[in-house]
Regions:
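Conserved catalytic/dimer-interface elements of ABC ATPase nucleotide-binding domains
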Residues: 79, 87
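A short, surface-exposed alpha-helical micro-motif characterized by mixed small hydrophobic
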Residues: 71-73
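ABC ATPase "signature
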Residues: 89-90, 98
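Conserved ABC ATPase nucleotide-binding domain signature region
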Residues: 4-5, 92, 104
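Conserved catalytic loops of ABC-family nucleotide-binding domains
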Residues: 45-63
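ABC family nucleotide-binding domain
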Residues: 1-41, 52, 56
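C-terminal boundary and immediately downstream tail of ABC-type ATPase nucleotide-binding domains
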Residues: 97-122
Length: 122
């Protein structure tokens, strides 16, 4: 019985995805869908989206994000752009193993640096 503005960011995101799915589209565009929520809610929403994608195998999700970790986690194919130009379009594993441009290599280096940081904390 709450008004939309009284819902948390995560609740609003879930409702937005549910409303879009109710129209039964073949393709869904998600533009920074988890950008305005805390890290815990973001992870929950990412996991829920993965589950939905598996359950509704006939759907294509186009996810726009500035978070390379999110793109690699959720994407079966990832398109990396720099200044409006396509740098690479591949599976996440291929991008990690074989970056095609200096920009992509630098992006991958940030992922590896973050991994090293978290490893050091253990």
């Amino acid at each position: 019985d709450r008004k939309p503005k009284q819902l948390s960011g995560g609740q609003q995101q879930r409702i937005g995805v549910a409303r879009a799915l109710a129209a039964n589209p073949k393709v869904m565009l998600l533009d920074e869908p988890f950008g305005a929520v805390d890290a815990i809610t973001r992870l929950q929403l990412q996991n829920e989206l993965q589950k939905i994608h598996k359950e509704l195998g006939d759907k294509t999700f186009v996810l726009v994000t500035h978070d390379i970790n999110e793109a690699f986690k959720l994407g079966t194919r990832v398109l990396v752009m720099d200044k409006g130009k396509i740098c690479q379009f591949d599976a996440p594993r291929e991008i990690m193993r074989n970056p095609k441009t200096e920009f992509v290599a630098n992006l991958i280096a940030t992922v590896k640096e973050q991994e090293a940081f978290w490893s050091e904390l253990k």
